[in-house]
Amino acid sequence: MSSNRVFKGFYGAIIILIFTLPILSSCGGRSNKDQSAESKEDLLPDTLSMLVKFENSLFPLPSPYQASTLIKKKNIPFDENIVSPIDNYQHFSTAFKKALNLGIYGTDLSYLNIYDRTPESISYLSVIKNLSDQLGISASFDESFFSSVERNINNKDSILVLLSKSYRNTDSYLRVNDRKNIGSLILAGGWVESLYILTRIGKGTNDREIINRIGEQKHPLDNLIEILTPYYYKSQEFSTLIDGLIDLAYEFDGVIYSYSYKEPKIDVDNKIIYINSESRVVMSEYHLETVSKKIEAIRNQIIG
């Protein structure tokens, strides 16, 4: 069986993950002056974000390509110990755990894909398919969507639009079936793993750009907490997760953050927001250490 055929068999399952994940980086864009000097391909990852609608609010979440661009630009070596152990999925017995770890494995798959780790990616895709089937969320996609992804797999712009549309399909499916909590948990798991990977890389390289990108997660974290808060009393698992994220948010209060708002351009049909605002972040080594410890503790609770 060819590798393309194998990936086609599993790719549909991961699509549920990739488009929902606030993977690794913040929504902040760069200045127009800096952007004009770059090619369209380089500009896309840092200026495209997706909109997640929750109740009557729209939350911008980073595009899946921001992390890939940053890590590739830095030529950071692959670390096989960063990703969550794949065998853990057999121990997830509740929908809460399955949804959170679906998000985590989706982020891990993105990390593996950066380094073209095809054998590992296939294994993670298999587990993701298993979990998504158990959660009953694979039904929101059809064959035409998978065919479109396959045809456009090397076109970042087209893929981002497809993923945004697929988010709309799954979001609608979860809402109709009164399962919005599952979507929020997938988002949470993906964000937690994203920040965990960034902190591991930031501490290992002491790269200032990466460390400051970690600091930029302050506002996405606030958004995530707001999305999860309605479920605080749904279960002890929810309240523990939210309390941990709130505790983490207090650590971000020590990050120096300035923000200059500029009107964004919004593509309502595809739920894409082009960020034009500018931000400046300074994160100390102390806050990097405290954030790293707290996000690792939250992650360990999720994957354990």
Where do the language-model regions lie?
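Bacterial N-terminal signal peptides that target proteins for export
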Residues: 2-14
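C-terminal motif of bacterial Sec signal peptides marking the signal peptidase cleavage site
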Residues: 23-26
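A structural signal for well-ordered alpha-helices, especially hydrophobic packing surfaces
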Residues: 106, 110-113, 132, 136, ...
